[in-house]
C-alpha cells in the first residue's frame, strides 16, 4: 500500500504560518484543508483517474507570504522567543508570520510527545503571533496620545513637558529608558521620543472611561477579524483605577495584554488612514 506524506521543504521557516497536517491540522493546512482535498479538474479526467485507481489531485492554494520577508524575520529573531508579522495595510495581505521557538512540520508526528510535554516555556506549537499575549509597551502610547487628542482637539499642540528622566508623582516614579532626560518637549516631540514621563503625565489627565472605550474600539476585549486561532487581547483599567495603575497603563504596562497580530492590525489601520482591512 502506497503511503502518502506531506513534505514541507522550508522546515521551521513557515512552521506556524503553513502549519502541519499530522496530529491534527494548523495554520493554512487547517484553513485550506477543504480546498486542498477537493478537485475542480475536468469531470471526465477525474472519472478516468478514479476508474484507474489513481488519486485525484486537490486544488492549489496560493498564499500571500513573502519568502524574503519571512527569512529576514526568522533570522532576525535568532534564538529568542518572540514573534514577527507584517501585512500590507492597504489590502490586508499577510506578508510574513514568524513565531519562535518553532518546530519542523516534517517531524511533528514522531516528535509529538516531546512537543506537547516538553519545556512549557518553549511552547513550540504555540503561534505567538496570534496566540501569545504580551504587555504592549510603548506601542500603547498611540492610544494614550489619541485619547488626549480627542479630549483636547484644539489644544493638544500646546502641551509641554520637561523630562528629567524620572517622572515623580505622589510616591511613584516612572523612568524613561536608561533614565534618559529628554528635556522640554511638545506633544509631537514627546511622542517621537516615546517619553515615559510625558505619557504617564498625560494618562493622569485622561477620562479613564473614554480611554477604555477607545481601547475597545480598537478591539481590546473584542473578537478579531481573523480565521486563525487567536487569543483575545485584554484591557482591564476602568474609571476606578488608582494612580499607579494609571501611570503604568498609560505607557503600555500594567495589566494590559495584546497579541502581536492585534498590534499589527492597529498599526495597519493607522497607516491606512484609519481603515482596517480584513487580514488574509
Language-model regions: role of each:
Residues 84-89:
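Short hydrophobic alpha-helical segments used for membrane anchoring or interfacial signaling
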Residues 90-138, 143-280:
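Beta-lactam-recognizing serine transpeptidase/beta-lactamase-like catalytic domain environment
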Amino acid at each position: 500500500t502506497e503511503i502518502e506524506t506531506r513534505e514541507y521543504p522550508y522546515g521551521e521557516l513557515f512552521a506556524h504560518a503553513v502549519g502541519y497536517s499530522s496530529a491534527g491540522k494548523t495554520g493554512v493546512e487547517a484553513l485550506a484543508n477543504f480546498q486542498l482535498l477537493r478537485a475542480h479538474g475536468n469531470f471526465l479526467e477525474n472519472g478516468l483517474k478514479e476508474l484507474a485507481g489513481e488519486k485525484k489531485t486537490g486544488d492549489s492554494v496560493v498564499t500571500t507570504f513573502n519568502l524574503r520577508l519571512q527569512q529576514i524575520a526568522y533570522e532576525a529573531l535568532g534564538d529568542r522567543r518572540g514573534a514577527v508579522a507584517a501585512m500590507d495595510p492597504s489590502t490586508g495581505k499577510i506578508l510574513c508570520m514568524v513565531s519562535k521557538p518553532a518546530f519542523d512540520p516534517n517531524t511533528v508526528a514522531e516528535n509529538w510527545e516531546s512537543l506537547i510535554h516538553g519545556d512549557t516555556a518553549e511552547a513550540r506549537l504555540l503561534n505567538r503571533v496570534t496566540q501569545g499575549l504580551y504587555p504592549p509597551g510603548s506601542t500603547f502610547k498611540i492610544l494614550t496620545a489619541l485619547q488626549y487628542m480627542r479630549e483636547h482637539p484644539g489644544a493638544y499642540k500646546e502641551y509641554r513637558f520637561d523630562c528629567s528622566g524620572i517622572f515623580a508623582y505622589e510616591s511613584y516614579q516612572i523612568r524613561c529608558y536608561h533614565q534618559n532626560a529628554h528635556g522640554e518637549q511638545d506633544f509631537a516631540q514627546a511622542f517621537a521620543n516615546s517619553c515615559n514621563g510625558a505619557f504617564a503625565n498625560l494618562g493622569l489627565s485622561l477620562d479613564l472611561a473614554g480611554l477604555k472605550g477607545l481601547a475597545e474600539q480598537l478591539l481590546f476585549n473584542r473578537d478579531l477579524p481573523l480565521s486563525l486561532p487567536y487569543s483575545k487581547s485584554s484591557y482591564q483599567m476602568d474609571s476606578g483605577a488608582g494612580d499607579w495603575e494609571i501611570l503604568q497603563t498609560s505607557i503600555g504596562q500594567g495589566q494590559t495584554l495584546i497579541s502581536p497580530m492585534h498590534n499589527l492590525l492597529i498599526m495597519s489601520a493607522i497607516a491606512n488612514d484609519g481603515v482596517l482591512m480584513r487580514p488574509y
